[in-house]
């Protein structure tokens, strides 16, 4: 457990966040498939390290623990490893996270995949083969990682791949990020309407392609929350003005609703989070976060701390993340004095009361619950349970907080006997 005293924010502190987990995980799959890629500033997140380890080992059974991205990307990756049978498994929670839409798409492409326990869920037994089918239909409202998983192997297929997305597209920005990465490596792709086409990669050049991974905008979101509540300047390194990360939307969102201006220093790839003096907060925040659901927890906590009514939609995918994030938010926001209503894809504030005494935030084995609630320490002392969950995406989070806060962050040892 981490106890965060009621704190103040220091001004003009600079933080270096490691590479984007989303980009790093995509690059690791491409590096393994095409080999002529060198990655700089790779994410130091647990998810990325688990994926890297899985790709480097030649074992029949691969356990990726809580790493949902690795589960999805490796399902497609092992599907094209001709002559190799792989059992892909994970943690208890991973076995509760649906993967049927991706498996069905791969089965329709001719891959033999077997559910070893419950229909539609890991663990999976995958028999790799050469894929000759060229088209597949996929529901558009599923996790973008399912679609990305198919896109990452598409350039390796002899005839490429056409993916027809049926229905309304969810998290489009993450799909576009994947296509941008493919294009940078010379894999031709197009996204017109609801159809994505990826051509087979034929330019097997011998020269090494270097890719510098931009820092992680999802991780940056917590510092936007600190800046919004503490009204002090924070600098973050290795961020690009023209980012392909969907969560870079945090810059516009926090400027509009919380008066945090993002100033880019392009030569240094540094951004400054600058609070606007005399900013008038909105009467209510109404926002569709369909394209950036991973930063919704951060925004809800910021709004709750400032007692700004909010209504956030487009959050259907949060139900099947590391935990049911909407239910987790509903439970933990009550401790901050914020009553909410949730549906399958929305969360709405109903009433603001005073925060509870002795606040202890459950994380539900979800890294984003720990980090999104941490900025509330600028309002009131609180404790974050199971603080080590941050290792999934941001192992240095607590150390970086100590650089920007005027307070003590202490570890509480819990006797579990």
Range-by-range predicted roles:
Residues 1-417:
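Short, structured segments at the rim of ligand-binding sites
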């Amino acid at each position: 457990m981490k106890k965060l005293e009621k704190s103040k924010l220091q001004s003009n502190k600079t933080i270096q966040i490691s590479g984007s987990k989303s980009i790093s995980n995509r690059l690791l799959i491409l590096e393994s498939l095409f080999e002529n890629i060198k990655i700089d500033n790779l994410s130091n997140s647990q998810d990325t390290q688990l994926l890297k380890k899985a790709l480097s080992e030649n074992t029949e059974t691969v356990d990726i623990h809580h790493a949902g991205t690795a589960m999805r990307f490796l399902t497609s990756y092992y599907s094209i490893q001709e002559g190799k049978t792989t059992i892909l498994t994970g943690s208890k929670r991973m076995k509760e996270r649906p993967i049927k839409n991706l498996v069905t798409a791969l089965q329709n492409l001719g891959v033999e995949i077997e559910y070893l326990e419950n229909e539609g869920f890991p663990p999976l037994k995958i028999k790799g083969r050469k894929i000759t089918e060229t088209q597949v239909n996929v529901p558009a409202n599923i996790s973008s990682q399912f679609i990305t998983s198919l896109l990452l192997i598409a350039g390796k297929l002899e005839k490429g791949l056409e993916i027809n997305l049926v229905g309304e597209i969810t998290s489009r920005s993450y799909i576009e990020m994947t296509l941008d990465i493919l294009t940078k490596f010379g894999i031709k792709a197009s996204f017109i309407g609801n159809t994505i086409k990826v051509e087979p990669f034929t330019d097997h050049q011998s020269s090494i392609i270097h890719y510098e991974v931009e820092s992680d905008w999802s991780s940056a979101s917590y510092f936007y929350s600190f800046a919004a509540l503490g009204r002090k300047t924070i600098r973050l390194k290795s961020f690009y003005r023209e980012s392909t990360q969907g969560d870079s939307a945090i810059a516009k969102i926090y400027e509009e609703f919380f008066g945090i201006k993002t100033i880019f220093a392009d030569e240094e790839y540094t951004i400054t989070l600058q609070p606007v003096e005399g900013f008038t907060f909105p009467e209510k925040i109404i926002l569709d976060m369909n394209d950036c659901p991973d930063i919704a927890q951060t925004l809800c906590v910021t709004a709750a701390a400032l007692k700004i009514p909010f209504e956030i939609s487009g959050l259907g995918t949060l139900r099947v993340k590391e935990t049911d994030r909407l239910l987790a938010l509903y439970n933990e926001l009550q401790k901050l004095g914020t009553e909410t209503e949730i549906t399958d894809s929305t969360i709405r504030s109903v009433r603001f009361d005073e925060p509870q005494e002795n606040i202890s935030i459950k994380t539900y084995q979800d890294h984003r619950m720990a980090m999104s609630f941490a900025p509330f320490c600028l309002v009131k002392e609180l404790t974050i349970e199971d603080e080590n969950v941050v290792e999934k995406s941001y192992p240095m989070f607590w150390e970086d907080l100590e650089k920007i806060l005027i307070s003590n962050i202490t570890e509480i040892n819990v006797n579990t006997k």
